[in-house]
């Protein structure tokens, strides 16, 4: 399966305005869209949103998103989830027509997509940078009580 890179993270937050003050004001993510209860942000190097904040009763990670190389990779991931007995569903979101959401065996909420709406290039708008001026989201840090087992699973199943 052709996973290209980390694509996005969606966080449930208890206070959207306080979270925006942190991610946008302090860290320097760029706000691209805000609607009732949701905000979409990105780093200055990115051409699509990479951080979605959603107002919720409790703070949590809703999904860890990965971009795949081809449409066929989404089909292969659906087959993988089905063969493993993992719950999955298809959804759409702003700028992304099809997102495959999968709950992995270790409890992580994963998401996979191929196409995303391209946003305007803003990398050289240095006057707009805030804080450290985040360029991109490029990795996730995950904690697991079974690190070896989780690592082996991902290497064997998802490459």
Where are each of the predicted segments found?
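Class I S-adenosyl-L-methionine
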Residues: 24, 75-78, 82, 155
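N-terminal beta-strand motif that seeds the catalytic metal site of vicinal oxygen chelate
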Residues: 1-17, 61-66, 117-148
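Vicinal oxygen chelate
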Residues: 78-136
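Short, amphipathic alpha-helical segments
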Residues: 71-75, 93-96, 131-134, 141-148, ...
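Non-catalytic surface loops within mature trypsin-like serine protease
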Residues: 15, 45, 55, 68-70, ...
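Conserved short beta-strand elements that form part of the metal-binding/catalytic scaffold
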Residues: 30-62, 109-116
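DNA polymerase sliding clamps and clamp-related checkpoint/processivity subunits
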Residues: 51-60, 64-69, 74-78, 89-92, ...
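Core segments of cupin and vicinal oxygen chelate
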Residues: 1-48, 91, 101, 142-159
